[in-house]
UniProtKB/Swiss-Prot annotation:
The keyword ATP-binding applies. GO terms for molecular function: ATP binding; ATP-dependent protein folding chaperone; isomerase activity; unfolded protein binding. Keywords: ATP-binding, Chaperone, Cytoplasm, Isomerase, Nucleotide-binding. CDD domains: GroEL. Forms a cylinder of 14 subunits composed of two heptameric rings stacked back-to-back. Interacts with the co-chaperonin GroES. One of its GO terms (biological process) is protein refolding. Its main location: cytoplasm. This is Chaperonin GroEL. It is found in: Cytoplasm. Residues 522-549 are annotated as: Disordered. Belongs to the chaperonin (HSP60) family. Its EC number is 5.6.1.7.
Amino acid sequence: MAKQLVFDEAARRSLERGVNAVANAVKVTLGPRGRNVVIEKKFGSPTITKDGVTVAKEVELEDKLENIGAQLLKEVASKTNDITGDGTTTATVLGQAIVKEGLRNVAAGANPLALKRGIEKAVAAAIVEIQNLAVPVEDSDAIKKVAGISANDDQVGEEIASAMDKVGKEGVITIEESKGFDTEVDVVEGMQFDKGFINPYFVTNPEKMEAVLEDAYILINEKKISNLKDLLPVLEKVAQTGRPLLIIAEDVEGEALATLVVNKLRGTLNIAAVKAPGFGDRRKEMLRDIAAVTGGEVVSEDLGHKLENTGMEMLGRAARIRITKDETTIVDGKGEQAQIDARVNAIKGELDTTDSDYAREKLQERLAKLSGGVAVIRVGAATETELKEKKHRYEDALSTARSAVEEGIVAGGGTTLLRIIPAVRKAAEGLQGDEATGARILIRALEEPARQIAVNAGEEGSVIVNAVINSDKPRYGFNAATGEYVDDMVAAGIVDPAKVTRTALQNAASIGALILTTEAIVSDKPEKPQQGGQGGGGMGGGDMGGMDF
């Protein structure tokens, strides 16, 4: 396909028009008084949302050149959302402001590369100041406020804070759709995995169809068990203790399974067998996690172990094990905390290096199971449209709460971005020429989120920005929800995670600076409408008029 090439100012202005198209649709959602955006869906009911990244992802422009600019700004929103789960609208507003102010200076003759360097140096100074202003999150009250602000709903904040209290800050919290109208929080204590009993004869409670083993031993075997001869030595040793036994293996089949069932039915041994969770290398790691939690060892040929030589010291222990047809829960495993901590640290190391969202999700699940619990928030609503929107707000609020725990909180409502302006201005004083101009571009952009929040609340943005900047109080800001000025935004519960503010600024500045230094665009040439389309239709009327298609 033929390409079109556009250069210089024309290229940059095309990108700017695309940036403006996305930003103007997204920024109306910013703040507590932000408006909704209705998104048409080809199938099903329309989506109504106040989530910036959801709006941004739906924007596709007809003009190919403008669409490139739109895609670049969408990248800002998506990347910010991937890292923190919030701050997408702030990042979009910052990106638009940097592009607008920057292109004005480029058109006036400024050196784009010098502007880019100035913006980058100003961002570095801004990030240091954000970290200085951050307050550590030490109680559930702060988490409740952060999550509540993200979702624009105090009830959401309360439920997420409650779930975090129950499972810990590292715990897994999943958001699911409820079949009813009400939202509820369920907490599963202990370590749970999605594999149930291999055979229903292992059930100890027929009414509930579950097997419960109290003060049980746990045999963790990496391979299939089918040969009774290999398993018999362990069974005899456990039988002498009179305690129950849980076998976790790739599978248990043949004469080994038949013997277990017979012994269970006769009452010789209270026993149950479940398949190991996961697949491949992930299964091996999950078995090692279970071993760490229960104080046992994985019987693995890779480690030189054989099932027939397994001693009692290699078996794990747990106070209670509950097994249903779908899942197994191990409560109060007897593993040493040092071993569990070592596994946790190893998983955190993998989390820092992985690029895959799927791998990250699975690592987070393992981390939570080791840390002692899983909470499920089941979101209820009256209609499908409301349910989708509500569930999305819960997911955003949860990500925001995690970000707050990670790097602390700062004053919200765009206040922190205004408060770091003096530090950026000081950094700009050490710069020369167009680099100093680049720093001033960022200073101007830092005002935009607070201005837009005020505009969405029906106030005069510039008046509010000036009032906050000129105040001597370090956390003085404007509460757009009530239309009042507040002496201490953090004390008033109007807060943002420092990580969200930092990430939004970094991503916006990165894309903004790239657009300023763009000198050419190469894109597909628009296709011309085919000639003679009408004539073809006329011809078809003669011979084919009676045919049905």
